[in-house]
From Swiss-Prot:
Gene encoding the protein: rdgC
Keywords annotated in UniProt: Cytoplasm, DNA recombination
Listed name of the protein: Recombination-associated protein RdgC
GO molecular function, one term: double-stranded DNA binding
Predominant place of localization: cytoplasm
Domain of life (superkingdom): Bacteria
Organism: Pseudomonas putida (strain GB-1)
Lineage of source species: Bacteria, Pseudomonadati, Pseudomonadota, Gammaproteobacteria, Pseudomonadales
Length: 306
């Protein structure tokens, strides 16, 4: 269990995440298939294992892991629009009258309902790790919308979930731009060979650099003309590499081989033990990494009450 993306959410109040109570709460909204006339369903699933006996909360030391699954019927808009157009033309030709918006919308709804049972189904899972002592929920996603879907559903079953995205005191753009300009990142961090530069002017240009020396004259020239760094590839110690963006999203997160080998040694041969060992080691790494990252970005803005 290694996260590939990371969104960090800060609990603004202390929440007693008791595993048994959380298990019962998640069980009140299990994932289920879409009914024939449903566009989408959303609910919780076991993060590891299958079957009714698989727990919805994976407990590893002080850390908890949960997962949710979204199931949705895929109706291509072009297919629906073509069917609506064909039906409207048929009515206007046969009845010699114009079809206006209200009737067109009704036709569209009827066509969607007729097509739904035959639509393809797409399933997607999302994981979240809860670290009560650290006061954070970590979501394995680069999409704020997907993360908010999970958190709002968790809030629904728990009754309350005081949480907000983690923020820092200095805009990440300013810090990343300074690191590339000065050719020196904060202690423990190393700038790699990929970045995105944007012009600060409205509708300004975008430059994406890959496998490029970011200390070179070309990059410095872009920065001197007013562009800023909005995404930056970084490495931390000998443990992690990742892309950091201007919204504090961590993407393409990669745990270095030494960590993965350690998890394999700790986990042994059983799949369940391997899963638990990698999750535990990942969370211990995050517990060390996130405070250092926040400090490097100017310090975390801690909400009142925390």
């Amino acid at each position: 269990m290694w996260f590939k993306n990371l969104l960090t959410y800060r609990l603004t109040q202390e929440v007693p995440f008791e595993p048994e109570a959380l298990e019962a709460a998640l069980a009140s909204k299990p994932a289920r298939p879409c009914a024939s006339q449903e566009l989408t369903t959303y609910g919780f699933v076991a993060p590891f294992g299958k079957g009714e006996d698989a727990p919805l909360v994976h407990v590893s030391g002080e850390y908890l892991l949960i997962a949710a699954r979204k199931e949705e019927r895929i109706l291509p808009s072009s297919v629906v629009n073509d069917a609506v157009k064909e039906k409207v033309e048929e009515i206007e030709t046969e009845q010699m009258r114009k079809v206006y918006k209200k009737e067109r919308d009704q036709i569209k709804d009827e066509i969607i309902q007729a097509f739904l049972p035959r639509a393809f189904i797409r399933r997607s899972m999302i994981f979240a790790a809860i670290a009560p002592r650290l006061g954070v929920i970590l979501v394995n996603s680069a999409s704020a919308k997907r993360a908010e879907d999970l958190l709002s559903t968790l809030r629904e079953v728990m009754g309350s979930l005081p949480v907000r995205p983690a923020t820092v005191k200095v805009a990440p753009v300013a810090t990343m731009t300074d690191w590339v300009k000065s050719q020196q990142a904060a202690e423990g961090f190393h700038v790699l060979d990929e970045c995105e530069l944007r012009d600060t002017a409205e509708d300004g240009g975008i430059v994406r650099c890959k496998r490029q020396d970011l200390t070179g004259e070309e990059i410095q020239l872009h920065l001197s003309t007013g562009k800023v760094v909005t995404q930056l590839a970084l490495a931390w110690q000998d443990k992690l590499s990742f892309i950091l963006d201007d919204k504090m999203v961590i993407k393409r997160l990669k745990f270095e081989e030494l960590l993965q080998e350690q998890a394999e040694q700790d986990g042994g041969d059983e799949a369940a033990q391997q899963f638990d060992a990698s999750f535990q080691l990942m969370m211990m790494t995050f517990a060390e990494f996130l405070p250092v990252l926040f400090e490097a970005l100017g310090g975390e803005e801690i909400p009142q009450g925390v």
